[in-house]
Design a protein with these regions (language model features):
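ACP-dependent fatty acid/polyketide chain-elongation machinery
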Residues: 1-68
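Acyl-thioester C-C bond-transforming condensing/cleaving domain
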Residues: 2-4, 20, 31-37, 88-100, ...
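Structured loops at beta-to-helix junctions and adjacent beta-edge loops in soluble globular domains
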Residues: 12, 107-109
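Generic hydrophobic secondary-structure packing signal
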Residues: 24, 75-82, 167, 171
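Aromatic side chains
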Residues: 25, 42, 63, 75-78, ...
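A glycine- and small-residue-enriched flexible loop/hinge segment at structural boundaries
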Residues: 41-92, 141-155
């Protein structure tokens, strides 16, 4: 039998519809806030579903330089900000002696959907020469992992998980196993998603995966 290492959680970060840090998030949970309201990220007038749980009032400039954030898809910004929060909460430090034993795994179901959608429109209306050279790096699901690893200086195991709604949980599970087997000393892990776009909402609605109770969005989720 392998000699499994004990695994513990040392820090938490959160960018959510009910709070943009762990304290706000816990308070939102305690108050029973669900974060669901009318869509503001785009005009949903032609969509059968007109509400979503959006991340609001996030001050990304507190964590990411403005010039950098323009080159990052929204999902990657969420992932990096939450990772930075969790790392700070943990009290850990990364240096030359331990960097190779600290890794990052962040899951994402669709990655940079907003980037893909906006650049497809540019391609259609303005031609291929106007497509951003950052399109592919911004779009790929592993960009949140890569950017978080660079920002924190983590040089250990690094990968991304793309398993739909289970991506974040799978990222945590994969990290748990690496720690349990002694392949890493610490892992920054979780999930990041930003699929509230015209295409994302239309696609989920067409799949009958969304509620159309637009008159009462706060009570629309009925599992």
């Amino acid at each position: 039998m392998p000699n499994f290492h004990r695994v513990v959680i040392t820090g938490i970060g959160a960018v959510t519809p009910i709070g943009n840090n762990i304290d706000e998030y816990l308070l939102g949970l305690q108050k029973g806030i669900n974060g669901v309201s009318g869509i503001t990220l785009f005009d949903p007038v032609e969509h059968p579903c007109k509400f979503a749980a959006e991340v609001k009032n996030l001050k990304s400039e507190d964590f990411i330089e403005a010039k950098e954030s323009k080159r990052w898809d929204r999902f990657a910004q969420f992932g990096v900000i939450a990772a930075k929060q969790a790392f700070k909460d943990s009290g850990l430090e990364i240096n030359e002696s331990n960097a190779s034993k600290i890794g990052v795994i962040i899951g994402s179901g669709v990655g940079g959907l907003l980037t893909m959608e906006s650049q497809a429109q540019i391609l259609s209306h303005k031609g291929p020469k106007r497509v951003s050279p950052f399109t592919v790096p911004m779009m790929i699901p592993n960009m949140a992992t890569g950017l978080a690893a660079i920002a924190l200086g983590a040089k250990g195991p690094s990968s991304a998980v793309s398993t739909a709604c289970a991506a974040g949980s799978n990222a945590i599970g994969d990290s748990f196993r690496l720690l349990q087997l002694g392949k890493a000393d610490a892992m920054i892990c979780g999930g990041a998603e930003a699929s509230i776009t015209p295409l994302g909402v239309a696609g989920f609605a067409s799949a009958k995966a969304l509620s159309f109770r637009n008159e009462s969005p706060e009570t629309a989720s009925r599992p």
